[in-house]
């Protein structure tokens, strides 16, 4: 079942407010990652939901105190996961009246297919005002595919990349699920990464490549993969990641946009 919930909130600066609202809800590829257009997920994937908290109350010392709760309802509307409200406290260092919020829900490898609803509820502990938002997602049947696609600033995948600038190193992290194994008990999965410029032209004549075909324990259902992309010039690009199961003769592709800013 769904598990491993993480709720985070980082401050861009709330101020005195007349009301509390949750706005700009969007699915993303990982924490601080680019927007994800599809709300369809394979078992083993992770749902990242980003949103903005507007109108929280800041004290004289800039502290903002609030609670966040999350509930997941499965097909038919029955609640299958609930995390009670958790107290959060941040400091209004930059002023303003907005806090970015994030929710993460891990989808189990055996999660039943169907439509699920995530409900986030935020309460301003000073004003006692409450606001909620809902996000529907669809869990697909098990299949070969790429899951847990995230962007990080470190090879361990622990530091979200966030805004991108010239000179940075970008790590594209993903996992492969639903693969088959050959006669020797090993998978044979080829990975490719291409970067396309704003006009859709590949930035390199050949894609970055990798292969997973040995050393995989017999019971491992997930294959991790990673590519390093050096951000040497500004612009808008599309990153295209492809996985091919050469045992089953199946391929899947995921793509997402990135914008690299000039650092001055």
Regions found by a protein language model. Name each.
Residues 15-264:
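Intrinsically disordered, low-complexity terminal regions enriched in Ser/Thr/Pro/Gly
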Residues 2-12:
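Sec-dependent N-terminal signal peptides
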């Amino acid at each position: 079942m769904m598990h491993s919930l993480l709720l985070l909130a980082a401050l861009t600066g709330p101020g005195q407010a007349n009301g509390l609202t949750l706005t700009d809800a969007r699915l993303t590829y990982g924490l601080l990652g680019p927007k994800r257009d599809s709300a369809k997920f394979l078992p083993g994937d992770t749902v990242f939901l980003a949103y903005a908290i507007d109108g929280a109350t800041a004290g004289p010392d800039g502290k903002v105190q609030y609670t966040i709760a999350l509930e997941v309802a499965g097909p038919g509307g029955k609640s299958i996961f609930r995390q009670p409200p958790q107290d959060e406290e941040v400091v209004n260092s930059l002023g303003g009246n907005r806090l970015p919020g994030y929710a993460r829900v891990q989808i189990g490898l055996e999660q039943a297919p169907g439509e699920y609803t995530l409900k986030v509820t935020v309460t301003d502990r000073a004003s006692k005002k409450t606001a909620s938002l809902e996000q529907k997602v669809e869990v697909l049947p098990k299949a070969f595919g790429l899951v847990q696609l995230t962007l990080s600033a470190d090879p361990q995948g622990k530091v979200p990349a966030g805004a991108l600038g010239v000179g940075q190193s970008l790590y594209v992290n993903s996992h492969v699920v639903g693969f088959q194994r050959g006669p020797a008990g090993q998978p044979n999965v080829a990975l490719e990464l291409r970067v396309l410029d704003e006009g859709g032209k590949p930035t390199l004549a050949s894609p970055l490549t990798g292969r997973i075909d040995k050393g995989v324990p017999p019971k491992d259902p997930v294959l991790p993969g990673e590519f390093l992309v050096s951000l040497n010039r500004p612009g808008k690009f599309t990153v295209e990641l492809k996985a091919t199961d050469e045992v089953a003769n199946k391929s899947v592709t995921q793509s997402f946009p990135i914008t690299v800013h000039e650092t001055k």
